[in-house]
Amino acid sequence: MKWLASIGLSGTVLALFAAITSVAIGWTYLGTKAQIDFEVRRAEARQLLEIFPPETHDNEIVDDVFEVAAETALLGIRERRQGYRVRQGDTVVGVILPATARDGYSGDIRALVGVRRDGSVAGVRVVAHRETPGLGDKVDLRKSDWILDFNERSLNNPALNGWNVEKEGGVFDQFTGATVTPRAVILATRRAIEYATLNASTLFETEADSA
């Protein structure tokens, strides 16, 4: 019967080892997930502050969120996303909206569009894309400063027909060998401004307004 006892002991040891391993893996996962969440949040905050620098507001933009419904046509988003409010004291001075250009050359181009209370653009940043390296990827600020041409633009600057690449009668530069990508970002930005304008009473509402 010693061999039965030995088997029983071995089974107990294996079960104990498996339990300890599972706990260790669980703790490792939680620790890794926490680190990943922290890094994602830090990157997100950095992008928001590129659009509205610290001197333009006194709130933590990354924490001042509102929900944007899925399938919001003007923003091009398919799933529910978050937008951000930018405040100075009790005044909402701007918003940062999620926008997706569905007509990129290689698929969706996701961006953040900052719009001030007066309807002017504070900044635009492309946060995800699959555009061709060396061509369409110039929408990324790390590749070129093309995206900065949106700064201070509005629905009146330029007029509606100016929101296109120069090749098609607009005021924005196209890329050599790539017209589809910049045009997609241009139109997505314009639509985001239109969304902000149409929903200004809600987006820029203060606590005093809602009281």
Descriptions of predicted regions:
Residues 1-211:
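Flexible, solvent-exposed loop/hinge segments and secondary-structure transition points
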